[in-house]
Amino acid sequence: MEPLQRKSELDFQSYRKMPLAQQRTQRLKPTSPEELHDLICVGFGPASLAIAIALHDALDPCLNKCAPTSGWQPKVAFLERQKQFAWHSGMLVPGSRMQISFIKDLATLRDPRSSFTFLNYLHQKDRLIHFTNLSTFLPARMEFEDYMRWCANQFSDVVTYGEEVIEVLPGKSSPDSPVVDYFTVLSRNVETGEISSRSARKVVLALGGTAKLPAELPQDPRIMHSSKYCTALPNLLKDNNEPYNIAVLGSGQSAAEIFHDLQKRYPNSRTSLIMRDTAMRPSDDSPFVNEVFNPERTDKFYNLSAAERERSLKADKATNYSVVRLELIEEIYHDMYLQRVKNPDETQWQHRILPSRKITRVEHYGPNKRMRVHVRAVKDGKDSLIGDGKEVLEVDALMVATGYNRNAHEQLLSKVQYLRPATQDRWTPSRDYRVDLDRSKVSAGAGIWLQGSNEQTHGLSDSLLSVLATRGGEMVESIFGEQLESAAVPDTRFRAML
């Protein structure tokens, strides 16, 4: 064996024996806040985490034969408002499972050789064989969140938690520069209130959703969004054996899960599920329909006309919006049936479903200091009455499961709106998620990307986990493609062996 080849094999074996965490920290290194970054990601949820993983893998010589081994190092930072990594912590309902296959993790569909796959997580946790014995593709939601936290922990050197980004400002390398060539990201420490400033040529906004609450609901600490169910409700209703009255508003998966879980969490309570629809409807996750979440469908959707996109979103609505997994519907129906066996009068049931209803008014204080929720029966989504049409519920808490808004980026980008093309009055992402900017005002090396807020242009899967692995790779190519290519090392026998 030639000396070079022997040394290469030894280097390779040495690399393979390194702890996984050590391998990863070599890929992305911390950058001083005072330095100009290549990239700042605002938010460090699953979308940004998928970008971090894809960038790590692009720099890994075991996965990318042309990965730079020395010289260029990306200067990246991730800013996250939460104090630690968390994914829908308020909806980690006991017993809840994922609604997608674990194969749609943060890496597998992009490159199953990645060390960030769900299967490797199980291997590292010494649970792979035990998980296999479950014979399921749908892990517990709690376990999948732990998987993502395990991934996130490998990037602690480049993530700053407890930093809420408040503004993105334009920046010029010199006062005389005719164009903006970087952006300044201002953030506030959530504990101290201290304002920090970082600059980057490229900025990704991956902010996630913000709670959507119906306008007719007043502000009251006893009215809370479903995203706070597991974290805030236990602080409000502290005695699990107390006979509380609790109402849930909504007809989707979150509403159904909360309604079902309340009956176990507070066994002596009375619960009501209020919905405008006539019944809970099952989600359609059949194989052909489920192809709407295939990564390649993003290309097809993006190339549709605006009218065709609208029709497509409407046709695919049953896969994600205001629908419930059939197994849960059947379990809830069984519980309702057992109540019917005991008493045919539904108005006397401990747990009730109120379909074709809407909340018209909420009084803060009624008898026993409970809220008075005024409910009105509707027909076909209109205000026409059914029967007497009115009912008043006295409740200790109202859980609102009415979805999320995904427009938080608009406020953060208000100071750079003038950089949009004159013909556009909104932020318009291209296929690679980079928003259109007036290039007479912004240099080619500077840009802004949006994640999770592009359903109207990129399809139903834009805010979901299904495409994150593939999209993470697309984002790295869009943001760092030229730098990776220019820093690439030509193939050697060592690289060929890998």
Curated annotation (Swiss-Prot):
GO biological process, one term: cellular response to oxidative stress
Gene3D superfamilies: FAD/NAD(P)-binding domain (3.50.50.60)
Disulfide links within the chain: none
Pfam families: Lys_Orn_oxgnase
Swiss-Prot/TrEMBL cofactor(s): FAD
Traits of the deletion mutant: Essential for viability. Grows only on siderophore-supplemented growth-medium, but shows decreased conidiation.
Recorded GO MF terms: ornithine N5-monooxygenase activity
InterPro entries assigned to the protein according to its UniProt record, in alphabetical order: FAD/NAD-bd_sf (IPR036188), Lys/Orn_oxygenase (IPR025700)
Subunit organization: Homotetramer.
The family this protein is said to belong to: Belongs to the lysine N(6)-hydroxylase/L-ornithine N(5)-oxygenase family.
PANTHER family: L-ORNITHINE N(5)-MONOOXYGENASE, MONOOXYGENASE
Function: Catalyzes the conversion of L-ornithine to N(5)-hydroxyornithine, the first step in the biosynthesis of all hydroxamate-containing siderophores, such as the secreted triacetylfusarinine C (TAFC) involved in iron uptake and the intracellular iron storage compound desferriferricrocin (DFFC).
Protein name: L-ornithine N(5)-monooxygenase
Taxonomic placement: Eukaryota, Fungi, Dikarya, Ascomycota, Pezizomycotina
Gene: sidA
